[in-house]
Amino acid sequence: MSAIEVKNLVKKFHGQTVLHGIDLEVKPGEVVAIIGPSGSGKTTLLRSINLLEQPEAGTITVGDITIDTARSLSQQKSLIRQLRQHVGFVFQNFNLFPHRTVLENIIEGPVIVKGEPKEEATARARELLAKVGLAGKETSYPRRLSGGQQQRVAIARALAMRPEVILFDEPTSALDPELVGEVLNTIRQLAQEKRTMVIVTHEMSFARDVADRAIFMDQGRIVEQGAAKALFADPEQPRTRQFLEKFLLQ
C-alpha cells in the first residue's frame, strides 16, 4: 500500500488551472523532494494533499483514507479530519501560536484533537524538543526564539501527532541563511529514521543528498521524476536541465 496516492489532481485559481491532472505516489518510508521554479504548483500540490486547498478534481489517498474531490468536501468532513490526523504539515512561516509557550504549542494537537492525556502529551513534547535540539525551551514564547528555533518547534509539533507522513512547504525559505542548516539537519535526521516525507524546497544540494526521489514541476505539471541523485546528475528533460543548469555547474 502507498503512503500517499494522488490521482488526476486538478486545481484552479480564478478560472486558471494551476495543477493539470497530477499523479503522485509516495511509498512508506520514502523521502520525496519537489523542486521547480516559483509558481510551478509545488506548494499548491502539497496543500491539496492535506486539503488546505480544495481541488476541482482528483482523488487523494493517505493510508486507507481516500478523499474524492469530485464529491462535496462538506460531505466528507469526517474523512478529511481523519486524513489530517495522519498527515503532519510544516509551514514556511512556522504558524506557531504566538500567545502560547513552546510546550503549549506542541501539546495542543495531541490533547485537543486526539484526546491524549495532558501528562502523556507533555512528556512526549519534552522528548521531541530534545530530539530537535531545543530541550529547556519549553516555557519560551515563539517571539523569543530565532526563526530556525521556531521552525524546529513546528517540526516537533508535527511529530507530536504521530503522523504517517509529513509534508514540508519550503521549510527554510523564511529563514536567515545562517539558520537554514539547523533546520535541514533536523529534517535529515528524520529522513535517516525512514519517515515518509514530501518536501517542497529550493535547497538543491539538500534535495539531491537527502531525498530518495526528486520531482521537477513546471507550469502545474510534473515534467520529470526519478532517483534524486540521478535526476540531479543527468536530467533527461531539457526543461529540467535548464532549471538545474546553475546548480549542475557548481
UniProtKB/Swiss-Prot annotation:
Listed name of the protein: L-cystine transport system ATP-binding protein TcyN
Name of the gene this protein is made from: tcyN
Keyword rRNA-binding: no
Membrane topology, from the record: Peripheral membrane protein
A Pfam family the protein falls into: ABC_tran
Cysteine disulfide links: none
Family recorded in the similarity comment: Belongs to the ABC transporter superfamily.
Catalytic activity: L-cystine(out) + ATP + H2O = L-cystine(in) + ADP + phosphate + H(+); D-cystine(out) + ATP + H2O = D-cystine(in) + ADP + phosphate + H(+)
